[in-house]
Regions:
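Conserved small/polar residues in nucleotide/adenosyl-binding loops
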Residues: 384-390
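Glycine-/Pro-rich loop/turn segments that contact NAD(P) or position catalytic residues
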Residues: 84-191
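Conserved glycine-rich Rossmann-like NAD(P)H-binding loop of the short-chain dehydrogenase/reductase
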Residues: 30-39
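Conserved Rossmann-fold cofactor-binding substructure of NAD(P)-dependent oxidoreductases
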Residues: 59-73
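Active-site-lining helix/loop region of Rossmann-like oxidoreductase modules
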Residues: 10, 150-315
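C-terminal active-site/capping subdomain that shapes the small-molecule cofactor and substrate pocket
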Residues: 252, 264-382
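N-terminal Rossmann NAD(P)H-binding glycine-rich loop of SDR-like oxidoreductase domains
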Residues: 9-23
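Rossmann-fold cofactor-recognition segment
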Residues: 50-62
Length: 392
């Protein structure tokens, strides 16, 4: 199959898609790339505004023939077109059918679960890497845990991560959360091992992996912990990584568990966070969402340049080995996490699948429905100049 395009950015007219376009143009080192979406006029505008000389491909997310023409020519498809459960399923299916690697920025694990069930075996047999969640959801959690594990050189019993960040609210994430609230996903949302293969965890590991985290003082990092709004997305990805690594005989540890929290400087801040998280949950599952939704950022909108520039994320990891030793690692990133950091990360993931595929984890023939850590290793973080976790 003659693939004459290295990377296609699908959803290039959206806010995050346009950031990916700008970033890829800034680091372009001779690759062939294109922009794609469903609206020719908007794609033309993106090309004009960014002074691009790249191919424009029109392909609606429901047009299987157009998607097929796109994926037959593309080595890697980078998608920012969410909510992904609405707009992404046929694109992923086309990537698997036509042997194109794929990355995106979804946090919709219930959708990823469906992809695993439908496409993992075929993608694995073809050596095609389908890697969702390559943005702020869930690379800091996933690659932070992965890299910390390489530094302790011992089987890991437990990792707890603690997150703080500053940035604008992601309109796409909010739209996804509102749409998920009406899908009746209770059992799936509560399954802490939703993305894991069957029989890849014990009941004891399940019991130690509850989403019901409260407020606690963490002496190791001199801070308070509380619920983190993205933990339900990130934790499932990290646990799938652990299972996929175990299949390659590279497991974190047979007793490995992972939980995720928000990081707070004071007990009072943690209390406020707890009640805010509860309030968000109530809004999403009740008619209150119809009152709040008109005031939320709309898909396609995003934060100002100032907010993007001054944002950051700060993740701390407490790593406990099976022999009881504890270490603390820290991972930092500059820029608004939901947009600037996310656009850089997912673009570097796509570039890794073009430039470094022969040296990526698992070997050149490895494939399936993967995670950033199991499918890419440390490569995306090192290229974006984010700070890899260092021992605190």
């Amino acid at each position: 199959m003659n693939k004459d395009i290295d990377i296609v950015i699908y959803g290039a007219t959206g806010f995050t898609g346009q950031l990916c376009v700008k970033y890829l143009k800034s680091v372009d080192d001779g690759i062939t790339w294109a922009i794609a979406g469903r609206n020719k006029a908007k794609l033309d505008e993106v090309a004009k505004n960014n002074e691009l000389e790249v191919e424009i491909i029109v392909a609606d997310c429901e047009d299987e023939e157009a998607l097929g023409l796109l994926t037959k020519r593309s080595k890697v498809v980078l998608s920012t077109a969410g909510p992904f459960h609405r707009y992404g399923s046929k694109l992923v299916a086309s990537c698997v059918e036509n042997s194109s690697h794929y990355v995106d920025i979804t946090g919709e694990n219930f959708w990823v679960k469906g992809l695993i069930e439908r496409h993992h075996e075929e993608a694995a047999s073809k050596g095609i890497r389908i890697i969702p969640s390559c943005g702020f959801d869930s690379i800091p959690s996933d690659l932070g845990t992965y890299f910390a594990s390489t530094q302790v050189n011992a089987p890991i019993k437990r990792v707890e991560s603690f997150h703080s960040f500053k940035g604008g609210a992601s309109a796409g994430t909010l739209e996804t959360m509102f749409s998920m609230g009406s899908l009746g996903l209770g059992p799936e949302m509560q399954d802490t091992f939703l993305l894991n293969p069957k029989d890849s965890f014990s009941e004891e590991q399940r019991e130690l992996s509850s989403d019901r985290v409260g407020i606690a003082k963490k002496e190791e990092i001199e801070a308070w912990s509380g619920p983190f709004v993205m933990a339900a997305a990130n934790t499932r990805v990290v646990r799938r990584t652990a299972a996929l690594l175990a299949e390659r005989q590279e497991n974190y540890g047979t007793e490995f568990t992972y939980q995720e929290h928000a990081f707070h400087a004071s007990r009072w801040s943690a209390i406020i966070s707890l009640f805010s998280t509860i309030a968000i949950g109530i809004v999403l599952i009740t008619p209150l969402k119809h009152l709040v939704r008109p005031f939320m950022p709309k898909p396609g909108e995003g934060p100002s340049e100032e907010v993007q520039r001054t944002g950051f994320f700060d993740c701390k990891f407490i790593v406990e080995t099976e022999d009881g030793d504890k270490s603390v690692f820290r991972m930092l990133g500059e820029g608004d996490p939901g947009y600037r950091v996310t656009s850089k990360l997912v673009t570097e993931c796509a570039l890794a699948l073009v430039k470094d595929v022969d040296s990526l984890p698992g070997g050149s023939e490895y494939g399936g429905l993967l995670t950033s850590a199991s499918g890419l290793g440390e490569t995306p973080v090192s290229y974006t100049h984010l700070t890899l976790p260092t021992k605190a």
